[in-house]
Amino acid sequence: MPQNKLFIYLTIVIGAIAMGWMVKDLSSASLDEKNKSQNFLESDDSDVENIGELTAIVNPNWVREEPSSSMRIAQFRLPAESKDIEDAELAIFSGIGGSIEDNLNRWFSQFKQPDGSESKSKARVRNFMVGGMTTTIADLTGTFTGGGMPMSESVEKKDYRLLAAIVKGDSSIYYFKLLGPRSTVGLWAEAFGQFIGNLRKVSI
């Protein structure tokens, strides 16, 4: 399925939930992708969790992990379809320095493209509202080359995909970074869209 259609479909899912109505026509997603993800999506066992000042509905098939860095406020492992494929990881940050654009550009720079072009030019970025909060989502594929920190180890992971969402809360900005093999991230793209679309401010 063309990557552009996947991104459009993801934005529809998030936007639909954010506006309080669900997408009924899923024709833009292939039947194969829908069948693979259906068991993951259709569950009454989702957990409601607080993430900073936000409430989130977490898919029950996502595995909560101890954050691997003090910069992360939460971390989840998203299982691959089979054991011979790597899992994906959702890392959630808050209170990190730099603007939204700065951080997105830093994440984009962690990828390189087969044709040698700048990854920033290949990324798809869109803004809209989720639960009254300004939200930016980004989608990029390519060869992942490392964590982006000064002491991080250089890697070469081909055919990787980044799905990112940045949500501006009342007092903090929340960064959601889903990273992994393109097939694994694609498997969870709709669930990620639902997760972001259902984010709300904590009621006081």
State the predicted function of each range.
Residues 1-88, 95-133, 141-163, 167-204:
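N-terminal targeting sequences that direct proteins away from the cytosol to non-cytosolic compartments
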